[in-house]
């Protein structure tokens, strides 16, 4: 018959109220935890000069050495320490295909025989030439006070031109559809920037380098904001996403054909394309813009801030200096828009919500660049572009 448990009475070390038996001695939790920490101290460390210190007095413990000595004298035993009782430390790593094969998820299905060492080059020089021609044209003459208002009017005009056109639903995303939407997106961004007076004053090479780097981030925000705007006006179903000029697609009901750009299947490359997290983020961004319902002026500033900061961080040097100057000038004009036109004395909360959207897209751009690097290392894609910097975030 086991010995009875005596769980009441004072702690045998310090005299405080006990909490049970610890390491063979009736003690409080404090003394038990102390002994667990100090049982491995060296003999030299546990020697006290006085040797007769009072363990607990005036609400505090006075001498660690005498306290440890008392623990040993009353019978605390370090051999009674219990280990491997922590569920976290004792559980094994959940088995998965990644653990079993010893390969990270993003290269789980990487098959060397499907790698594409020799690639087909897609020449997009004609797009660069078209962009140069657009930048050489005279901008729209609008009697507006600043460039942010000019860009806002340009955006409204670009979207207004499509009001009477029927929106086409893309059910299959293959080579033709991808190249077409990329071409439309790039030229759309160039057209918008061509009406940005301060941007037109930059050196020709700087302008083209910025456009080639930032157009993807620009068009992504443009399409998300256009989708949100159409939902607010009840002209687009909630399951649809704008992807091109007058074209959209169901976010959960479309076919993807990758045979033109890789030897791998869509299932094998799920990591590189629209993952469930990506879709969730896009839906949330659209809903945030529906709730905020930003004006064309606010959208124009967001487009500038997102695209120019992305280009500046990627290219550095003179381009970073130029983009920072452009963004700062437009920030001042946005302040005037809030303070003078809308008569808002406190707009920081709204601006924070708008910038949260651009920060989310910035993070998405960085992730896409890292994925592209992984794809290049393993030769996942069998195509390349004559101007690769234009497509590192597609």
UniProtKB/Swiss-Prot annotation:
GO terms for molecular function: DNA-binding transcription factor activity; RNA polymerase II cis-regulatory region sequence-specific DNA binding; zinc ion binding. Pfam families: Hormone_recep, zf-C4. InterPro entries: C.elegans_Orphan_NR, HNF4-like_DBD, NHR-like_dom_sf, Nucl_hrmn_rcpt_lig-bd, Znf_hrmn_rcpt, Znf_NHR/GATA. Keywords: DNA-binding, Metal-binding, Nucleus, Receptor, Transcription, Transcription regulation, Zinc, Zinc-finger. Residues 8-83 bind DNA. It is found in: Nucleus. GO terms for cellular component: nucleus. Belongs to the nuclear hormone receptor family. This is Nuclear hormone receptor family member nhr-103. The gene is nhr-103.
């Amino acid at each position: 018959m086991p010995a009875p448990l005596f769980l009441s009475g004072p702690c045998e070390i310090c005299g405080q109220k006990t909490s049970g038996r610890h390491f063979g001695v009736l003690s409080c939790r404090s003394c038990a935890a102390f002994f667990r920490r100090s049982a491995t101290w060296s003999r030299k460390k546990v020697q006290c000069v006085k040797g007769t210190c009072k363990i607990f007095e005036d609400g505090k413990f006075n001498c660690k050495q005498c306290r440890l000595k008392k623990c040993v004298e009353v019978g605390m035993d370090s051999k009674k320490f219990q280990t491997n009782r922590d569920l976290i430390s004792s559980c094994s790593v959940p088995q998965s295909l990644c653990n079993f094969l010893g390969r990270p998820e993003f290269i789980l299905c990487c098959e060397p025989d499907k790698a594409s060492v020799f690639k087909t080059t897609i020449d997009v020089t004609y797009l660069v030439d078209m962009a140069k021609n657009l930048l050489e044209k005279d901008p729209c003459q609008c009697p507006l006070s600043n460039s942010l208002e000019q860009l806002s009017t340009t955006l409204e005009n670009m979207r207004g031109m499509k009001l009477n056109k029927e929106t086409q639903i893309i059910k299959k995303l293959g080579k033709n559809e991808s190249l077409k939407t990329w071409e439309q997106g790039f030229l759309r961004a160039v057209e918008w920037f061509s009406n940005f007076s301060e941007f037109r004053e930059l050196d020709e090479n700087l302008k083209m380098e910025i456009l080639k780097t930032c157009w993807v981030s620009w068009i992504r925000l443009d399409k998300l904001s256009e989708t949100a705007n159409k939902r607010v006006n009840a002209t687009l179903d909630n399951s649809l996403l704008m992807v091109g000029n007058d074209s959209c697609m169901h976010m959960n009901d479309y076919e993807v054909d990758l045979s033109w750009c890789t030897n791998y299947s869509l299932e094998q490359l799920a990591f590189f394309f629209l993952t469930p997290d990506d879709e969730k983020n896009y839906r949330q961004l659209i809903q945030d813009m529906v709730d905020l319902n930003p004006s064309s002026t606010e959208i124009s500033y967001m487009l500038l801030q997102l695209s120019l900061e992305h280009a500046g961080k990627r290219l550095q040097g003179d381009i970073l200096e130029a983009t920072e100057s452009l963004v700062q000038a437009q920030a001042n004009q946005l302040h005037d828009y809030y303070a003078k036109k809308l008569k808002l004395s406190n707009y920081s909360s709204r601006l924070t919500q708008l910038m949260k959207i651009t920060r989310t897209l910035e993070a998405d751009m960085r992730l896409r660049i890292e994925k592209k690097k992984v794809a290049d290392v393993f030769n996942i894609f069998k195509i390349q572009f004559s101007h690769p910097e234009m497509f590192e975030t597609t």
